[in-house]
Regions:
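Binuclear metal-dependent hydrolase catalytic cores
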Residues: 1-116, 196-219
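Cap/insert and terminal regions of metallo-dependent hydrolase folds
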Residues: 105, 112-116, 122-216
């Protein structure tokens, strides 16, 4: 029913317009609903403006019946977002990804289960509190970067690490919050030694650690 955006970095929003179009192509007959930080509407409106001529040609030529699927509803979070439907509750969490701000994680409550999703963040006390006794904490992790003077400076190394969470940060937060299972995602860089990463985090967290992959499914 809704798409939740954590922050306005390109790797989190670049496919948003294609999701809008693909959902319409595959039969969505209700508005495309997006929730995220202030600035989301401006971003999406500018993207839609760039594709307006192409979309108008599609609409005129393809004659699809589901016109409602092209309606858009954008909610920009003002302090806090809360959503409830069919026994599921979602709450936003403001996290620390400066200079990108605001940035959010999300809590999901399903029956008696609690899932917390970090979004991109350095160590965040808000996130720690929101993760207390969570059944699952899904958390990003900065693994490491090797210096390459063709694509980075020393400042690059320092600054990229500084607005993400190290393995120690992730493990310490999960332990402090008494998280039952920790699922790692959003790896920087994307290629790394999984067992070494789990071993490093397990120095600080004694629960189950799962290295997440796209399309993984977990039973609550």
């Amino acid at each position: 029913d809704i798409i939740l955006i954590t922050h306005l970095h390109s790797d989190h929003i670049v496919d948003l317009y294609q999701l809008y179009i693909s959902g319409w192509h595959t039969g969505r007959a209700k508005p495309f609903k997006i929730v995220g930080p202030i600035g989301l509407k401006k971003f999406f409106d500018k993207t839609a403006e760039a594709y307006a001529d192409e979309l108008n040609l599609r609409v005129d030529w393809e004659k699809r019946p589901n016109h409602k699927g092209l309606d858009i509803e954008i909610t920009e979070i003002d302090n806090e977002f809360i959503y409830e439907k069919m026994g599921i509750k979602i709450k936003s969490i403001e996290v620390q990804h400066q200079p990108v701000e605001p940035a959010y994680g999300y809590q999901f409550f399903v029956d008696d289960k609690k899932i917390t999703y970090s979004g991109d963040t350095r160590y965040s006390i808000n996130l720690e509190k929101a993760s207390e006794d969570a059944d699952y904490l899904i958390h990003e992790v900065f693994v490491s970067l090797n210096f390459d003077d063709k694509r980075m400076t020393q400042d690059t190394l320092v600054n990229v690490k500084e607005y993400h969470s190290t393995p120690k940060d992730v493990g310490t937060l999960a332990q402090a919050a008494n998280v039952k299972k920790l699922i790692l995602n959003h790896f920087v860089p994307p290629v790394f030694d999984e067992e070494s990463l789990k071993a490093e985090i397990s120095q600080y967290y004694d629960g189950e650690i799962i290295v997440g992959n796209d399309l993984d499914e977990f039973i609550l």
